[in-house]
Amino acid sequence: MRTTKLMAGALTLLVLVGGAAAAETVQSSESTVYTLPANVSRIEEYAFYGDGELREIRIPEGVTEIGDYAFANCWYLTEITIPESVTKIGAHAFDSCVSLKTVQLSDNITEMGESAFYRCLSLPEITLPASLTGISARMFENCEGLVTVTVPEGLLEIGDSAFAGCKKLENCPLPPNLTRVGSYAFDKCTLWNAELLPDTLTEIGEYAFRQCKKLTEVTIGEKLLNVGEGAFCDCDGIKKVDWQAKVTRIPDRVFQSCYYIETVKLPETVTEIGEYSFYSCGYLTDIGTFERMKRIGACAFSNCDELVNIGTLDAIEEIGGGAFISDQKLVLSLDGLQHLRIIGGYAFGGCPKVTGLRDLPALEEIGASALDSANIPEVANLPRLRRIGASGLSNRSLVTVGDLPSLEYIGDSAFRNATSLTTFGAAPNVTYIGANAFEECRKLETLGLDGVAAEIGREAFIACTSLKSLDLSNVTSIGEKAFSYCGTLETVVSLESITSLGKNAFEECRSLVTVGKIGNLTRLPNEVFRECKALANVTLPDTMETIGTAAFKHCYGLPEIVIPDSVTTIEEEAFSGCDSLKEIIVPDSVVKMGNHVFGGCRSATRIVFPKYLTYLPGSGVSFCNYMVEFVFPENVKSISNYFFYGCISLKEIVIPDTVTTIDFRAFWDCTSLTRITIPASVTKIDSTAFDGCKKDKLVWVVTPGSYAETYAKKNYYHYVYAK
């Protein structure tokens, strides 16, 4: 049963005419409709805050003000009538009255506070007072059921987020005298034809109409000089934009993701287009002529799939990163743009119809991947270019790069896969060449980088198969595989300034004959000259301490090598397969050697190991086919696995009396071995140590009663006693 309860006397949170206050508040589980006393003049802050029983309230004439949060969180309040006497509604007065369906406002209300009807989810429509001049911030935010708002003609301002999140709001005609729409004011509203923006508007805040899906046209009037970032972004119903205001800058993201925009008319006063302004406007074909345009911001026209024409850019100074990325239909020549200073990263990435990079006297920087898909056969007359970013000119159409006198920085992969590039002009001031900078530039023959004091990154020139000569005399650092697979490279004039050399730096430079003086390195890196089959001349510095793994492996043409007496370590396979070495003398400074260190040095006839080495590394001189003399270290204790394997010219050998062990297949296939002296110190000989030796021709020289004599008898080797 519907019950009406008269609130007898004054409530403690009501102000009576005359100022007296009562002592109690009516509480009743039956009470669903409250009727306030006739002598109430003001409903105070929080008067009914969170009242879970309140369904309807009757406010008498005479009340002039409803205080802040007065009815906030009255979840079951469905209806309220506000009398003509009320002139002010406080902030959050009806905040989160989620069941409120009917509100009748007095036309005498001149002030409604922030968030007054915030999150009134059930409210379908409201008529605002005729005397109201401004809608406060967040007043109807998240009123998800709100469809229609009637606003007075005298309204001047709609505050920030006033209707944000009113997803069903379709009807809210903007009055003719409106001057400001605040930030996020209609964010995510369905919205009707708000394209009818009044001529009086001077300001639209950021993201004011974001995701207003039913907007179809936008006209920016002449007085509307202040439009905020993202004001119309994600309004994918907009098809036409007419910007009449004489602005100099188009805001960031203003029409971002307005996919179906077809026509945009901008004023001739524009000198700058902000970041993401027209990002992903997929149907945009023409943006007009920009004779005064100086700057186009990052991603301003990115993913504009149908964009063909942007007119002249004669005044342009900067094209931001990703400005036109993936605009595959864009037709534009960059030749002769006299004021262009910067082409940002990815600016024209994926733009195959962009052409030209000549006669740009002001150009200082080409950003990462800026022109990787453009049609640019020639780069010429760029006197001020200082920097080319990563993949900046990674371009298969590029044939010639002219002189670049100011160039300092070549980024990673800057010219990677520029497979048609034949000439790179003089660039004497380069200090950095990034990783993979010229990778796979297989036709590159002329490289104007001789003598530059640069740092060269890893794989910078890998597989530049037409390079023939390099002057690296002032280069301080060369990264891993920097010149690997440069198959026609014959001469490296000098490496005398080098302080850092990466592994595999010249790997498989199969035509490389001469490497000039190497700088004061302490370590020669792993595989640095591996498979340099023609290498004939290399000088190691007297600072060298370590020769790395496979450093000269398969340098078949190397006739000699002088190992400085500063070297203490030679790692495994360091000289493996150096077929042309005739004599190998390892200085006594060496105390550590890796396996197979000289394995396969087929032409070496004499090999001298260092005095103080205490072991022979596995396969150390295996397959030294022409070796006839081997000089042991003085203190060696064992002959390791496969050490003399395949030394088919070795006829006679005397094992030092420091040796105690002859290991697995140590002399395997020494088919010419006829005499071996084994001292009494040897106490272990592996059963396979002499496999493949011709037993009928081999004579062991042993000490009477020694382990060697016993072994020879047991295994039927012919032996004689040492004298």
Question: Where does each model-flagged region fall?
Answer:
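Consensus positions within tandem repeat domains that build extended binding/scaffold surfaces
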Residues: 45-47, 67-70, 90-95, 113-118, ...
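Hydrophobic core
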Residues: 11, 15-16
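Short, structured coil segments at secondary-structure junctions
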Residues: 714-716
